[in-house]
């Protein structure tokens, strides 16, 4: 039983990383529609994950920059919660992460910070701090 649970955990982690890589690819291709699809999968399968929070923040900011009226107010309100989740994950140790996952987390952290700073410089404040 323990071996089966271990296998499921490894499979789940790889599936989550694959989604994170998919989001990064769609972000780099600037494809908002496909980014939304990946974000929806995160919300359905890994709602509390670091990558889900980061992907959602990045997607909402990009959508807001494209057209502020496309972003419902409740999504904007949730940004500060997601940002706190990201900050919490960033305080956790990264010793157990492999090189690929560490690089992916660094990319996500960098993109979240860049996008949040850009929007805050334009007068929209996400953080509740």
Predicted regions and their residues:
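Long, contiguous interaction/recruitment modules in multidomain scaffold/adaptor proteins
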Residues: 1-10, 127-128
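Short coil/turn linker motifs that delimit alpha-helical repeat modules in TPR/alpha-solenoid proteins
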Residues: 11-12, 31, 45-48, 74, ...
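Amphipathic alpha-helical repeat scaffolds of TPR domains
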Residues: 13-24, 50-67, 99-121
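Alpha-helical segment of the N-proximal tetratricopeptide repeat
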Residues: 14-41, 45
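Charged, low-complexity interaction regions
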Residues: 32, 68-73, 94-99, 124-127
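Secondary-structure boundary/capping motif
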Residues: 34, 38, 45-49, 56, ...
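Alpha-helical repeat scaffolds
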Residues: 37-42, 69-92, 129
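Short solvent-exposed coil/turn linkers within tandem alpha-helical repeat scaffolds
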Residues: 44-51, 89-102
């Amino acid at each position: 039983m323990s071996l089966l649970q271990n296998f499921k955990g490894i499979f789940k982690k790889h599936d989550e990383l694959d989604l994170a890589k998919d989001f990064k690819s769609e972000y780099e291709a600037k494809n908002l529609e496909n980014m939304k699809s990946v974000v929806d999968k995160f919300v359905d399968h890994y709602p509390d994950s670091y990558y889900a929070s980061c992907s959602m923040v990045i997607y909402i900011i990009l959508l807001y920059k494209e057209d502020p009226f496309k972003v419902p107010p409740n999504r904007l309100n949730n940004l500060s919660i997601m940002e706190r989740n990201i900050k919490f994950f960033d305080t956790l140790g990264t010793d157990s992460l492999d090189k690929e996952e560490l690089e992916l987390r660094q990319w996500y952290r960098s993109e979240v910070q860049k996008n949040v700073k850009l929007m805050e410089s334009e007068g929209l404040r996400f953080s509740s701090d």
